Design a protein with these regions (language model features):
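Active-site/ligand-binding neighborhood in enzyme catalytic cores
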Residues: 126-258, 464-478
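Conserved FAD/dinucleotide-binding core of flavoprotein oxidoreductases
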Residues: 108, 245, 301-306, 338, ...
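Structural core of flavin- and non-heme-iron oxidoreductases
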Residues: 1-36, 40-41, 107-113, 167-172, ...
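N-terminal glycine-rich phosphate/pyrophosphate-binding loop and immediately adjacent elements
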Residues: 2-148, 474, 518
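A conserved FAD-binding loop/helix module that cradles the flavin
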Residues: 503-524
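A glycine-rich dinucleotide-binding beta-alpha-beta segment and adjacent secondary-structure elements
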Residues: 194, 198-214, 377-389, 438, ...
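Extreme N-terminal leader/targeting segments of oxidoreductases
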Residues: 1-5, 23-24, 479-481, 485-486, ...
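Mid-domain catalytic core of redox enzymes
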Residues: 239-241, 260, 267-397
């Protein structure tokens, strides 16, 4: 049987792409290696009676256009905003809480000057976030096209981009450029004097970024994490009722209703090439499937290094993938709790327990964590962000009990000295629990069960090469027209008939649906 399009990988972007193609009348097949759709955006039971978002764990970047076009709310998706964005408990018993209408007063506890500067800082970031929101649903200019008429679309796109940037004054254009090149610490030093305040905001610069907040380029990662929105509120974060898998299931329902076929337990072994063109796939079970368009919703490194033979990949692409930087320093845990944690800095229940709880009191602490991971393999004083989604969603745990997501950094994607993650996973998990215990005594005793995912587990389970949650670092040389490489930023792969729609394409990582949407538009133009 032949298809108009086959999508490799049933993660949320692959499902979005399938839905748009099927709605346009195309015959579409999605192939997912695992037994469940959603890729890293899945909800599973990890301890009897306890369910949680296994890998990706929070909502902000999901594109409103995708939600509206695919009518995801009508397909069961319900997202609730967090009452507070972030909570930063400090070892000395103080704390900072970032929440609508409350952040400035919280900042004033540490610095009146910083509190006065905060509105201008937020307004400035919002200007740049609006730029990113506009770019997120646009195909980057293809800087790899040679001259002549073929270059006209790229030249038009570049001209449009230039005209839009010209609406910003020169100082804002300079500052936007700085955000792509400066470290998060350098950028925050321009605005604030208080270390806890810089830690509260600077944490966004190292989320999924195996780097220090002093690493050049980390300011962009900070910006990447503030351009989202939730239920129409810019910069807000939320929770999908039922976990992140509810997003994938709503998209899958939309795709099925449009006519797409979705298959699980259907791992792709290799691509089929005929006369230099990608024409189909061979599955792990030996089945051969053909299509006019093959769309890869996988890390580009996995695509070009594992699904194609070296001689089938153009030299420039092979070289680029050899240097494609993967590894986000991420160690992921889900824990079942008998009760809510009780923080020394802010005892008792409250909105802070529904926030992102950041256990990393300063930029210097984050810097030491990164340096220690590079030397030791993992930070002995790690960075832990904890979310307790059951405070907003009682479907995840038994009455009176809770689940928590622990997003932990920094850990080396590959351990030094020949050590193996399978031998050290539980030791590092104990360290992460102990880190939370320092801020919330009694936490360790409340843990009823846990799920532990090292970088190697994230790669084996979800295809996240090096455990990289973004399918490749969000560094300046791996963004926009260079994501995944010059000449392929327009969602067309290295060979005719091959397309890309995963997080290794523009606009980068996160549960956005943007890549699936834009890749579908390119495929529809070509078919």
């Amino acid at each position: 049987m032949s298809w108009d399009a086959i999508i490799i990988g049933g993660g949320h972007n692959g499902l979005v792409c399938a839905a748009y193609l099927a709605r346009a009348g195309k015959k579409v097949l999605v192939l997912e290696r695992r037994g469940v759709l959603g890729g890293a955006a899945v909800t599973e039971e990890f301890h009897p009676g306890f369910r949680n978002s296994v890998a990706s764990y929070t909502v902000s970047l999901l594109q409103p256009k995708v939600i509206d076009d695919l009518q995801l709310h009508a397909h069961g998706l319900r997202i609730v905003n967090r009452p507070a964005n972030n909570f930063l408990p400090l070892p000395d018993g103080r704390y900072l809480l970032s929440a609508p209408g409350r952040t400035q007063a919280e900042v004033a506890k540490f610095s009146e000057r910083d509190a006065q500067r905060l509105p201008e800082y937020e307004a400035r970031l919002e200007i740049f976030a609006d730029v990113l929101r506009a770019w997120a649903l646009r195909t980057p200019p293809d800087a790899g096209v040679a001259g002549g008429w073929r270059a006209l679309p790229a030249l038009w796109q570049m001209g449009r981009l230039g005209r839009e940037l010209a609406t910003l004054d020169a100082s804002l254009r300079q500052e936007l450029l700085d955000l792509f090149t400066l470290s998060a610490a350098e950028y925050l030093d321009r605005w604030f004097e208080s270390e806890p305040i810089k830690a509260l905001f600077g944490f966004d610069g190292i989320v999924g970024n195996y780097a220090s907040p002093y690493t050049p380029g980390s300011a962009y990662v900070l910006l990447h994490h503030v351009f989202g929105q939730c239920n129409g509120m810019k910069g807000a974060w939320g929770h999908a009722i039922g976990g992140m898998g509810a997003i994938s299931q709503a998209i899958a329902t939309a795709a099925r209703e449009a006519g797409a076929e979705l298959r699980v337990d259907a791992g792709v072994q290799r691509l089929l090439i005929e006369q230099g063109r990608v024409v189909g796939v061979a599955l792990a079970n030996g089945e051969i499937l053909r299509a006019r368009a093959m769309i890869a919703n996988v890390n580009p490194k996995l695509l070009y290094e594992q699904m194609l033979a070296p001689e089938q990949v153009p030299d420039a692409t092979r070289e680029r993938m050899a240097n494609w930087r993967c590894g986000s320093g991420t160690f992921r845990m889900n824990v079942a709790l008998s009760q809510l944690p009780d923080f020394r800095a802010l005892p008792g229940p409250g909105d802070h327990l529904s926030a992102g709880i950041i256990m990393a009191p300063s930029l210097d602490y984050m810097d030491r964590a990164w340096l220690d991971a590079r030397r030791n393999g993992w930070s002995r004083e790690p960075i832990v962000e904890m979310l307790i989604p059951s405070t907003l969603d009682d479907s995840l745990a038994p009455p009176g009990q809770h689940v928590a997501s622990l997003f932990c950094q920094h850990v080396a994607p590959v351990l030094p000295d020949g050590r193996h993650w399978d031998d050290h996973r539980e030791t590092v998990a104990d360290l992460m629990i102990a880190t939370v215990e320092r801020y919330a005594p009694g936490f360790a005793d409340s843990v009823l069960g846990r799920q532990v995912l090292s970088p190697l587990d994230l790669e084996r389970t979800f295809g996240l090469v090096g455990g990289d949650i973004f399918h490749g670092a969000l560094s300046a040389n791996q963004l926009f027209s260079a994501r995944p490489m010059v000449g392929q930023a327009g969602y067309r792969g290295a060979l005719p008939g091959l397309y890309l729609c995963g997080s290794g394409t523009h606009p980068g990582g996160g549960v956005t649906g943007a890549r699936g949407h834009m890749a579908a538009q390119v495929v529809l133009r070509d078919l």
